[in-house]
Amino acid sequence: MIPLALDEVACLCPGRLVVAPGAERVTGLEIDSRRVRPGDLFVAIRGGVEHVGDALVRGAAAALVPDDAFAAMAALGRAVRDRSAARVVGITGATGKTSTKDILAALCRPHVRTVAAEQSHNNEIGLPLTLTRIEPDTEVVIAEMGTRGLGQVTELCRVARPGIGLVTTMGPAHLELFGTIERVAQAEAEIVGALPAGGTIVLPAGESLLEPYLRDDVDVLRYGDGGDVRLLAFEADDHARLVVDALGERLELTFNFRSRHNATNALAALAVYAALGLPLAEAQRGACDVSLSRWREEELPLAGGGMLINDCYNANPVSMAAALDHLVERARGRRLVAVLGDMAELGPDAPVYHGEVGAATSRAGVEVLIALGPLARGYLEGAEGVGARLWAPTVEQGLPVLHALVRPGDCLLVKGSRSMGLEVIAEAVAAVPV
């Protein structure tokens, strides 16, 4: 972190500031007292006031109990960002933000000193945390921006001030909050309006919902079929091999992910990489160092040569369809088992979307479908071609069903919205000795 004087922290953040003896500045920021390092500023949010003493014992230079946690984090993130000449990339979109961020970070790191959001730090707390990791020599910052309402991306952009924006795949997500996919697009496209003149926006080719928000003074790069960065060929086994046309340059790249849907995320990342002026001919240097965030496309061995695909971080109709495609690609003759939890925030059409995903399981050749959660019952209604279909209202009630139906040698997908906590299922399956 670029150091901040404690006098400035006190001016920026109304509240109670407890300063360690002799401390004059902070060299890091933390909101989890267990992770505090000497010299950090500990910001007490969500009940963190109880841990102020622990943070100081661990060496914090100061502890802040802010009057307004969101405002304090924004002010601190903005203060660090304003001291840096780093180029900031902002990523929005309905699905694929975190994986695209992970791929872009891997591509950039061999060439420029890069800071990227950890996990899915993309809200009013997480984005400033990313910015406070900027060091004096940081050259590129990759900031993820989530949205739960109109105006939120605009506010996050006021803090991060990106010069390059990326909108990932659009689709029916957060409909409970926005009502229509057009309003989802409006929210995600706020990043276009926040870019400076001469900035660059990267977006999916053919995404008509975003076209009304484009500006004459912002450059546009498109990725996907018909775009500036497009996929010519794809194959995968333990690695994905992509042949790409990137701004007229033919690239052959090997990535250490396996799924076709991450190939689309890689195209988006390559477009941003090009917008940063990094050498396309050297993109392979980072391609095999992609480290996807936790609970995304994780593969673990199961008994009898089986495989668990743990993709339980989150879900919407687009990512569910992609995960089922990936299940088929990775099965290699194994029996297909899908454990699917609710897809949250889809609004009044949620039953329709769940039914469509259920139909997709049937088309994919899934032989066992275990649906978990009140909305997940809709999967069963669409999955008429699946041999064994079972539903449980909670994850806990689904565990006995899972143990009764899963056999050695199965290829099993676990996926659902974050609110379902399906990592419990994945951990239970993975705990069975191989």
For the regions a language model picked out, list residue spans one by one:
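N-terminal leader/targeting and accessory segments in enzymes
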Residues: 1-79, 330-331, 359-360, 364-378, ...
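Short acidic-hydrophobic, aromatic-tinged amphipathic segments that line or gate anion-handling sites
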Residues: 64-67, 389-398
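ATP-dependent carboxylate/acyl-activation modules
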Residues: 91, 97, 294-298, 419-425, ...
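Residue-level signal for inorganic ion chemistry
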Residues: 9, 40, 55, 76, ...
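Short amphipathic alpha-helix with an adjacent loop that forms part of the alpha/beta core around
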Residues: 399-405
